[in-house]
Amino acid sequence: MNEKLTKNQRREQAREQARLAREAEKKREKRNRLFLQGGIALVIIAVLGVVALVLTQSMKPAGPGPLNMISGGVTFSKDLEVVKTKALQDGDARKAPEQDWTKTPVDVTVYVDYMCPACGTFEQQNGDMLEQYVGSGDVNLTVFPLNFLDGQSLGTKYSTRAANAFSCLVEQQPENAFAYHNRLLSKEVQPAEQTTGLTDDQLVENAVAAGAKDTTEFKQCVKDQRFAPFINANWKSASETGLLGLAEGAQLINDPRVGDLQPADEPQRLRSTPTVIVNGVQWVDGRDGSLEEYILKIKGELDGSADKKKEDTAEAAG
C-alpha cells in the first residue's frame, strides 16, 4: 500500500511535472521550427530550380540553326535590315526565301566561305555597290555562309568558326551582321589560306569593330561554336542536295575553269565560291558583265514592265 504523499512531496511532484511539460513544449516548438525551416528551404530550392531552368532555356539557341537563317542564309533588305525568320529546327528542311521576280527588289544570293580568296576579292569589288542597292531597297541580298575550306586553316577550322561567329551575330545582334560580313571579307581582316586564321577572340574583336557588343552570350556562342553543325549542314545541302530558290530550268556552272553547265535533270550543286545567284539564275563574271551592270539590266527590265503595266491599266480605265 502506497504511503500518502506529504505536502512537500506533492509540491515537488507538481514542479517536476511542470518541468517535464515545459521541456516537451520546447521540443515540440523546436521540431515545428525545423519542419518550417525545411519547408522554406524546399520552396527556395524549387524556386531557384525554376529560375535556373528559365535562365538556362533563355541562354540556349532557338534551335539547331540560328534565328533569321531558316534558308541556311540570312537576307538583308531595305536599310540593311535582316529579314526575320524562325530558327531551323532539328530535322527541318531549309526553306528558300520568299521571292517575286516579277518586280523589284532584285534578289541576289551569295554563297561564301570566309577563307575563300575569291570571296574576298568579290566582296572588295562589289561590297560597297551591294550595300548601296540593298540600303535603297533595290536589292535583297542573301548571304549563305559555308565551310568547305576548313582544311586550309592548319587544323583550326577557321571557315566553320568564322561562319559560326557570323551566325551568332545574325541571331543576337542582326543590326550589325551586314557590317560584320563585309569586315570578315575585307583585305585588312580576311586571313590567307594555309594560315590558322583569326582566333575566337579576334573574331569577337572584329565584330565589335563592326559595331557589335561583346556580350557574354555572343562570346560564348563564338567559343562554343554553337552553330557549327548548322554550318556543316549548309555545305552538305549546297554541295549534295542542291541550291534552293533557283528559277525553273536554271543550270549552274559545272566546272568554273571550263564553263560547262551541270545536267539539267540533276540537282544543281555548288561547285565553287563565291557563287552568285540573281533572280534565280547564276551570274558568272566574264560571261555576264559586271554584277552591277547585270543587276541594273534586270532592274530596268522589271521597272519597264511595271511602267507598261501601269500604262495599260490607265488606258483600260480611260
Language model regions located:
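Short active-site neighborhood of thiol/selenol oxidoreductases, capturing the structured segment around
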Residues: 102-117, 123, 140-141, 145
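Proline-centered helix-kink/hinge sites
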Residues: 117, 128, 273-274
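Residue-level marker of regulatory loop/turn positions in helix-turn-helix DNA-binding domains and
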Residues: 27, 100, 157-158
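Extracytoplasmic low-complexity, Pro/Thr/Ser/Ala/Gly-rich segments
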Residues: 57-112, 126, 135, 306-318
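Active-site-proximal beta-strand/loop segments in catalytic clefts of secreted hydrolases
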Residues: 111-113, 144-147, 183-185, 278-281, ...
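Structural alpha/beta surface segment adjacent to cysteine/selenocysteine redox centers
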Residues: 120-208
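C-terminal cap of thioredoxin/glutaredoxin-like
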Residues: 3-44, 50-62, 208-318
